[in-house]
A protein has these predicted regions:
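Active-site scaffold segments
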Residues: 43-44, 232
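Compact, glycine/acidic-enriched structural inserts
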Residues: 216-244
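A surface-exposed partner-binding patch
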Residues: 117-201, 242-253
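A general structural signal for short secondary-structure junctions and capping/turn motifs
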Residues: 4-5, 34-36, 62-63, 181-183, ...
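Short, flexible beta-strand-to-coil junctions
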Residues: 16-20, 72-78, 150, 161, ...
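General alpha-helical segment detector with a strong preference for membrane-spanning helices
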Residues: 51-52, 140, 208
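Conserved NAD+-utilizing ADP-ribose enzyme module
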Residues: 2-32, 36-43, 50-118, 198
């Protein structure tokens, strides 16, 4: 979604970026973009999340293994001097900010630059195989296919306001080991991600049709798990940004 409503004082912009640049943004306390390199005469922020995510996934991830989508607001009074450029379809809109203007551009950022999504590259077979051997069970086939795609959402905000982190098989194994005592109360559990707080996104690997479920870290068993969506539908809604946590509806034993 872009912010071109002329009645607002700020314009919301998005920028795809890689690890090196986002580390420099973090070093600025999330207040400024770093100076352009000599071979980078133009700074390209874009006007919607979809386009930023497309670049992060198709350009940043293949080249650096990770791609980020950021969001920030810029004063309209400053930005109005630059025309909006259409770089393809009607949705492909961006600004071209000359490198020598970046200092002034940064001064007109209101608030902080926010990371809204991180994408990672395909997980190798070896990592899946090692985690499954250690756990003695398999991840859902649809989950493996998603994490072995060109780029998958590792963490980020949904358009619904939900925030989630999805785990690589190795991280899932580590979390399962740390959660060992509670995991014993959830036979067959496979941890797919977290809800950003105390909640884990899990599946019961004993049932190939089991949905993704939400459990508290202090859960005393599957009876308190809250079903979310079938694995394939969960992935589809994560990809669309429409996933929303369901907090009620625990499984009845």
């Amino acid at each position: 979604m872009s912010s071109l409503d002329a009645s607002t004082d700020n314009v919301t912009l998005w920028r795809p970026t890689g690890q090196e640049e986002i580390d420099l943004v973090a070093a600025s306390k999330w207040r400024a973009w770093p100076p352009r390199l000599p071979e980078q005469p133009i700074f390209y922020p874009v006007l919607n999340r979809w386009y930023a995510a497309k670049i992060a996934r198709e350009w940043n991830v293949p080249r650096g293994g990770v791609g980020y989508v950021t969001r920030f607001d810029v004063r309209r009074a400053y930005l109005d001097q630059f025309p909006v450029r259409q770089a393809g379809s009607r949705e492909v809109l961006e600004y071209w900010i000359p490198a020598e203007e970046l200092g002034a551009f940064n001064e007109n950022i209101t608030g902080v630059i926010r990371e809204v999504a991180r994408y990672l590259g395909p997980v190798p077979d070896e990592e899946f195989d090692q985690a499954e051997a250690a756990l003695g069970r398999q991840f859902p086939a649809a989950w493996r296919e998603y994490l072995q795609g060109q780029a998958w959402l590792s963490r980020g905000w949904m358009e619904t306001g939900s925030y989630l982190t999805l785990l690589t098989p190795g991280k899932s194994l580590e979390m399962g080991e740390a959660w060992e005592l509670a995991a014993q109360l959830h036979p067959g559990v496979m941890i797919l991600g977290t809800g950003g707080s105390r909640e884990l996104l899990v599946v019961d690997s004993r049932d190939p049709l089991a949905p993704v479920a939400l459990v508290d870290v202090a859960s005393d068993g599957w009876a308190s798990a809250v079903p979310q969506l079938p694995v394939g539908q969960f992935i589809s809604e994560v990809e669309a940004g429409t996933f929303r946590f369901t907090w009620e509806g625990a499984v009845k034993s």
